[in-house]
């Protein structure tokens, strides 16, 4: 039933979602991923096969779920103004939760850095740790992220003004900038002289920057999907909730990275 047909019988503007298997499948695949990862890390299972299987099921089911959401928004007209307001509110709460997670990681970092224990040698970084220099890859990544914030803003404003060509160009450049950031971060990790198991410094460093790295991988995927949708005329100047939330997400990650760079790379060294 299309939105126009439903409006004759429905006295409220909200979308009644049809029965879907994806929420329960995603939930169980997330549970399976967490359990298999914990079992593999503690040596209860000898390989990562269950982890990769759970990750494959999670990725596949999430992709199919978002496919249905795109169909409801683009082709069925189910995302009314009231629904879009609800989506924006939900995304805002998601951003708040992300900020609180990183606030906890910064707290852990400052707790260890401002009063290093005797076991750490009484200094920060601890004795034996060769910290990543802030003027090398981290500085390049900072410049890349600031540039991506500018290009995605240019693309967003071009879309609002109906300039599809510039919107596509800006989004294409932004997507590749984020991909380059992810590659540079991976190179930094592979060349670092310490690991996540090297005491509290390694743990909190990789917990903070690694969580941001995973979010950047997810952001690159979101940008690529929005580029595909924009090329296929899914997004208009007045209806582009998915793209708008992605832009906000990028700016939030930009700000978090600036704090990570200042605290973890510059002040912490």
UniProtKB/Swiss-Prot annotation:
Query: Keywords for this entry?
Result: Membrane, Mitochondrion, Mitochondrion inner membrane, Translocase, Transmembrane, Transmembrane helix
- Please tell me whether the keyword Flavoprotein is annotated for this protein: no
Q: What is its EC number?
A: 7.1.1.9
Family assignment? Belongs to the cytochrome c oxidase subunit 3 family.
Complex formation: Component of the cytochrome c oxidase (complex IV, CIV), a multisubunit enzyme composed of a catalytic core of 3 subunits and several supernumerary subunits. The complex exists as a monomer or a dimer and forms supercomplexes (SCs) in the inner mitochondrial membrane with ubiquinol-cytochrome c oxidoreductase (cytochrome b-c1 complex, complex III, CIII).
Q: What does this protein do?
A: Component of the cytochrome c oxidase, the last enzyme in the mitochondrial electron transport chain which drives oxidative phosphorylation. The respiratory chain contains 3 multisubunit complexes succinate dehydrogenase (complex II, CII), ubiquinol-cytochrome c oxidoreductase (cytochrome b-c1 complex, complex III, CIII) and cytochrome c oxidase (complex IV, CIV), that cooperate to transfer electrons derived from NADH and succinate to molecular oxygen, creating an electrochemical gradient over the inner membrane that drives transmembrane transport and the ATP synthase.
Question: Can you say what this protein is called?
Answer: Cytochrome c oxidase subunit 3
Which organism encodes this protein?
Lachancea kluyveri (strain ATCC 58438 / CBS 3082 / BCRC 21498 / NBRC 1685 / JCM 7257 / NCYC 543 / NRRL Y-12651)
Name the gene for this chain. COX3
């Amino acid at each position: 039933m299309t939105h126009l047909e439903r409006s004759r019988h429905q006295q409220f503007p909200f979308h009644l979602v049809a029965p879907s298997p994806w929420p329960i499948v995603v939930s169980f695949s997330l549970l399976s991923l967490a359990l298999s990862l914990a079992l593999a890390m503690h040596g209860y299972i000898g390989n990562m096969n269950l982890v990769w299987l759970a990750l494959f099921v999670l990725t596949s089911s999430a992709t199919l779920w978002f496919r249905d959401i795109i169909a409801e928004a683009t082709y069925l007209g189910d995302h009314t103004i009231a629904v879009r307001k609800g989506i924006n509110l939900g995304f805002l709460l998601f951003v708040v939760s992300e900020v609180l997670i990183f606030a906890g990681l910064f707290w852990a970092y400052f707790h260890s850095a401002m009063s290093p224990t005797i076991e750490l040698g009484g200094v920060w970084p601890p004795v034996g740790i060769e910290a990543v220099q802030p003027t090398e890859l981290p500085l390049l990544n900072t410049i890349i992220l600031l540039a991506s914030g500018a290009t995605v803003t240019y693309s967003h404003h071009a879309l609002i003004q109906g300039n599809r060509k510039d919107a596509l160009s800006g989004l294409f450049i932004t997507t590749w900038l984020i991909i380059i950031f992810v590659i540079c971060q991976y190179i930094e990790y592979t060349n670092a002289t310490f690991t996540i198991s090297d005491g509290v410094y390694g743990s909190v460093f990789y917990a903070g920057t690694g969580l941001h790295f995973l979010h950047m991988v997810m952001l690159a995927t979101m940008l690529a999907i929005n580029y595909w949708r924009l090329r296929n005329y899914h997004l208009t100047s007045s209806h582009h909730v998915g793209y708008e939330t992605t832009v906000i997400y990028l700016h939030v990650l930009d700000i978090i990275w600036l704090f990570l760079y200042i605290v973890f790379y510059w002040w912490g060294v």
